[in-house]
Each structure stands twice: as C-alpha cells, then as structure tokens.
Amino acid sequence: MQQAIEQYATGGALRFNGIGKVFPGVKALSDISFEARPGSVHALMGENGAGKSTLLKILGGSYQPNSGTLQIGEQSYQFKSTAESIAAGVAVIHQELHLVPEMTVAENLLLGHMPNRFGLINRGAMYRRAGELLKGLADEIDPHTRLGDLSLGQRQLVEIAKAMSRNAHVIAFDEPTSSLSAREIDRLMAIIVRLRDEGRVILYVSHRMEEIFRVCDAVTVFKDGRFVKTFEQMADLDHDRLVTCMVGRDIQNIYNYRPRQHQGPSLRVTGLLGPGLHEPVTFAVQKGEVLGFFGLVGAGRTELFRLLSGLTRSSAGTLQLDGKPLTLKSPRDAIEAGILLCPEDRKKEGIVPLSSVAENINIGARPRHVNLGCLIQGRWERDNARSQIKSMNVKTPSPEQQIMFLSGGNQQKAILGRWLSMPMKVLLLDEPTRGIDVGAKSEIYEIIHNLAADGIAVIVVSSDLMEVMGISDRILVMSEGAITGELNRDEADESRLLQLALPRTRG
C-alpha cells in the first residue's frame, strides 16, 4: 500500500489556473482557479448550470478552454483531445458511461491497448489482464461476460477498473450514484476511499449532501460559472453553510414579474404515475398562473412533462382540463386538447435544424379555416411566420434562414411562436432559458407573463433557483420522482427550495 501511495502522490496536485470557457452567447466558466491535492477526495458543488460538468469536460479533453491551463504536478496542459487527457493520467467517469455494451468486459477494459502477438489480439493475455484489474474491485465479474448483461453498478466498476488499467493519477466522478442502489453506493464509496488512500487526486461531483460529508476531504463551490470558495477542511463546514454558499447571490431585476388574477381551474393532475415518477403526483394549476417546478438532475420533472404532453403513457392517475376528464395516448391528443410542450433539448426535440425559421414556426400549425386550398394555405403560412417572427422579436435575416444558424434565444422564441399559432390552454416549458443570454431571457420572461395575463396556464421546469423564484406565482419542488414541497411566491427562498430538492436518504 505504501508503495502505491508514493507512486501516485508523486504525480502531484491538480491545479486549474484561470480556466475560462465561452459558448456562443454564454460564458460557461470565468477565471476558475483552485487546487485539488493528491490523496484527497475534492467535491465540486453548485446548482445545475454552475459549470461543474463543463470543467470536467475540459479536464477530460472533450472541451478546450478559451483561457487558462491545467497543471498536474509541475506539468502544464491544454488538452486538445480525450487521448491527450488520458495520456496525462486523467480519467473522467461520466454519468453516462463510455463503454460498449456489445463487447465483453475484457474488451472494454483494454480497448485501445489490447495485448497482441504476431499482429493478432492475444485473447488469453487479454482475459488474464482483465481478471487482474478486476481482482479486489469486482471479483464477481467474469471478464468474458458481455458488458450489456451487467448491472449499472457493475458497469461503473468496469469503468473504474479501466481508469486503473491506465494508471490514472486524476480520477473525476460526475454524479456517480444517480442510478445506483444503496448497496452499490456503499461499495463505490469504499472504492473511492481506496483510490484516495493510494495517493490519487479524486474529483467528485454530486448533489447528494450525505455523500459529500461521507467521503470528501475538501469542497469547492461554483456559482454561475465562477469560483465561489474552497473549504479545505470538512470540519469547517455543515449542511446549512454549504447550501448558503451554493445559493448566495443578488436577484437581478430581469424577471418582469407582475401580480395577476387567476381565472379559475385549468389542469388538475391526480395520483399520476409513470416512468420516472416513484410516488403518485397530484397538483393543479389555474388559468393565468405561472407554476414553477424546481428540482435537481434526476428529480423527475422532465419525465412528468413527457406524461403531460402524451410522449409517454401513465400507469395510474387521472387528468382533468377545464373540469372535464382528459386521456392522453399520444402527443397529438395533448396538442388537440391545447397542452403544448417546449422541450428541454430544443436542438434535438424542438427544432428541425436544416429547415427554415418559417417552416419551424409552421410545423403542425394550420389556419383555423379548413379546405382553403394549397395557394391560400401557403399564403397563410407565410403571413403566420412573419407575424410570429415580429411578435416574438425573433432576430433573423429572413424567414427563410435555416434555424440552426440562429442563437439559442431566437430558436426558443421561434418555438414559442409555433405554439402561439395554435389554440393553447396549457403551456409546458422545460428549461426555457437554458443556454440563453440574459437579454433573450428577459424577453422570454415577458412572453411568459403575457401568456399568463391572457389566461394561459404556464408550467415552467427550471433548475435555476433565481429564475423559478423570479417568474412563478407558486413553486412545486421535486426530488427523486416525487413532489417534496409546495411554496407560494412570498414563502420561497433559495435555502428552503434547495433543501427540499436535495436527496438525503436512499433506500
């Protein structure tokens, strides 16, 4: 053991020196500088969108920083590829594992550096080496087993063994327990302690407070892509102080909130169950109300929206719209009922990238007068696209411009324009301002408030605490597939919302 400690400790500390990363219209990281010591588990904490995953992608070579360098020991780096990161002794174990299900465990472990003899893969040596790597880590896993036949927890152990096969000095874990059982979590914690005790640098990203206090030696907090503080000693820290550090910032006056009168019941959900919901979900939203849903990654909010929009089928529960029973078997049922969804991943699910702005606005939209003929239909579509571009303030050179060349904010406004072309009663907005600059955010907030003033029930999923507090009349909090709290606008504060959203136990 002492030899292993000395082997990895000589790799030195991991230092981030002035790391900056800018995407079009968004500053993801700004001047990030801190140090993680060998022989320690260093947590990265912050809300969704704080910049943790972006930093890990830079560490792993998937992204290249616009400024700054990494330093491991005395050597400075700016990785231009994942191969360069691996060669420097870095392994990043992502939430979605980078393994090949159809290959055997041994093939996955040694992919890229398989033993060979006379130019052919030496399979005997490959399986022996794989067995050595799994020994003491996952003795029950047969190297000959097809990886797709393993549990998620076992696949994660294979990913860790793969990192060890490359003698990684720096190992980063990104939300590693999000889909693990309590027993698998216990096992993972023990392995992380073992890796730490060998002198490696361990970075650990998790929203689970109990894991942070259980296994970590230091914590660095991020907020809006900026470094906030590093706590070098866990003894200096408790749950409330960490939450306060994560959420502390001034509210910017960009939300355009104004009080409004609600106009009677709109959508009522009773005892709803389905994929991603682990307890029956019950709530109601009023006409003219903006109802916010807050939660962390994996809370079940997007899964709830998929049920409400007919993308997935419920296994239990009932829906009522305007006091009448509603059954959703498909997205068409939801659209015809007036329940419209702006999805979280607009590039994959919200737009057709190669089509024009006008074509994207008119997807599914039809004039209220039927049987008008092709010429009149075409004229209506042109007029409708121009009208929505103007009313939504979509910045585009032309309605015929391919939508892929617009900014994220203008793409989102075009999607909203599409739905305004149709009869609407309930609007579902899943992370409506993710990846959008502040100016476009303010415009989208204004659109939301105008829709509510017109009597539309607007339900907004957001991982941004300030946003959900700034635009909502009422806030529901979800955690691990269940509603864990409800707060009126004047009751909500960041600490209460985050405490309701943070999972504390796992059965």
Swiss-Prot record:
Gene3D superfamilies xrefs: P-loop containing nucleotide triphosphate hydrolases (3.40.50.300)
Signal peptide positions on this chain: none
InterPro entries listed in its UniProt record: AAA+_ATPase (IPR003593), ABC_carbohydrate_import_ATPase (IPR050107), ABC_transporter-like_ATP-bd (IPR003439), ABC_transporter-like_CS (IPR017871), P-loop_NTPase (IPR027417)
ABC transporter domain mapped to chain residues: 14-249, 249-505
Topology class, membrane: Peripheral membrane protein
Summary of subunit composition and partner proteins: The complex is composed of two ATP-binding proteins (AraG), two transmembrane proteins (AraH) and a solute-binding protein (AraF).
Similarity comment: family membership: Belongs to the ABC transporter superfamily. Arabinose importer (TC 3.A.1.2.2) family.
Name the record gives this protein: Arabinose import ATP-binding protein AraG
Organism: Pseudomonas syringae pv. syringae (strain B728a)
Lineage, uppermost ranks: Bacteria, Pseudomonadati, Pseudomonadota, Gammaproteobacteria, Pseudomonadales
Protein encoded by which gene: araG
